[in-house]
Amino acid sequence: MPASPIEVVGQWLQNLLDPGVVNSLVAPNATYVSLNTEDAELNKIMPWAGTSRGPQAFLDNLGAMFTRWENQAFKVTTMFSSDENVAVFGDFRYKSNSLGKVVTSPFSILVKVFDGKVTYLQFFEDSYATAASFRKDGSWIVQTEPGTKPFQV
């Protein structure tokens, strides 16, 4: 009998970069959605952003993340499941390897597990904060509401 969906996700979270474990837990056609489905500008900053497929995508995406950031803390605060759906919530602290900027962000992960295999994963975080950990210089002029004065960030 395969492990329960929550057990599968727990094992994956403990072995994110272990090819043997990832290949045994992730279905060959699994979908990995990181932050959004497609955003060309964000993808330039964080190449793993968007949609990719298969166990190698899980390994490549997380491998790319951890070459750019030092994982200083990753804490799961809540994890629960309903049928094949597993929800994971928590927060992390990363330090950018390029600039040494530290960012803290909440995260959420939706995982679907069928027959003991991850078939879908969607990861969300504070993309503005994490992307800003790579911001060397520059600013934006932003206008958030019609008729209001633009401001610089």
Question: What spans do the regions from the language model cover?
Answer:
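Short acidic-aromatic low-complexity motifs
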Residues: 2-34
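A solvent-exposed, acidic/Ser-Thr-rich amphipathic alpha-helical stretch
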Residues: 28-84
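A beta-strand edge to alpha-helix "cap/lid" segment located at domain peripheries
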Residues: 66-153
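Alpha-helix initiation/capping motif
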Residues: 1-2, 47, 51, 100
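Short, mixed-charge, low-aromatic patches
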Residues: 13-22, 45-48, 65-69, 89
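Residues that form generic nucleotide/phosphate-binding pockets
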Residues: 12, 25, 61, 65, ...
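Hydrophobic pocket/interface hotspot
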Residues: 12, 21-23, 30, 54, ...
